[in-house]
C-alpha cells in the first residue's frame, strides 16, 4: 500500500518511468484525517501536508501509464477500495492512460490462486504494452 502511494507520487512528479503498477494504495490522504505513516497531526492541524502528500490532488500531472489493482474487500482503514476507484476516475477524467483491476473477495493482501494468477497476468500485459522494447 505504501509502495502504491510512492509509485503514484513518483509518476505524478517525474518522467523517469515508462509505466507504473500500484496495488492497494492510499491516494487521497484527506480520507485518513487522523494521521498516516509518521504524520501524527490531524488533517485539520496540517491540511497542506495532507493535500501535498496526496497523489489524488496531483492527478492532473500524471503523464505515465498507471495500472491500479485493489482487493474488493480491502478492510485496511487507510486503503479502502474507494481510494483506487476515486483515483482511477480522476485520472481517467483527466485523460491519463490508466486501468483499474478490482480483485473479487480479496482484502489488502491477495490470497486466492485465481486472484494471484490474474494479478500476474494483468501486470505482465501492462509491462509488455508500456515498457517492453521501449
Language-model region placement:
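Active-site-proximal cap/loop segments of hydrolase catalytic domains
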Residues: 1-134
Amino acid at each position: 500500500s505504501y509502495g502504491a502511494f510512492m509509485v503514484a507520487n513518483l509518476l505524478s512528479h517525474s518522467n523517469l518511468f515508462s509505466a507504473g503498477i500500484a496495488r492497494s494504495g492510499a491516494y487521497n490522504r484527506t480520507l485518513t484525517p487522523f494521521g498516516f505513516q509518521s504524520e501524527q497531526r490531524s488533517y485539520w492541524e496540517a491540511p497542506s501536508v495532507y493535500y501535498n502528500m496526496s497523489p489524488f490532488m496531483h492527478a492532473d500531472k500524471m503523464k505515465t501509464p498507471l495500472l491500479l489493482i485493489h482487493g474488493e474487500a480491502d478492510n485496511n482503514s487507510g486503503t479502502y477500495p474507494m481510494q483506487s476507484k476515486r483515483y482511477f476516475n480522476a485520472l481517467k477524467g483527466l485523460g491519463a492512460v490508466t486501468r483499474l483491476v478490482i480483485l473479487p473477495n480479496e482484502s489488502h493482501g491477495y490470497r486466492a490462486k485465481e486472484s494471484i494468477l490474474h494479478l500476474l497476468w494483468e501486470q505482465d500485459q501492462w509491462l509488455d504494452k508500456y515498457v517492453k522494447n521501449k
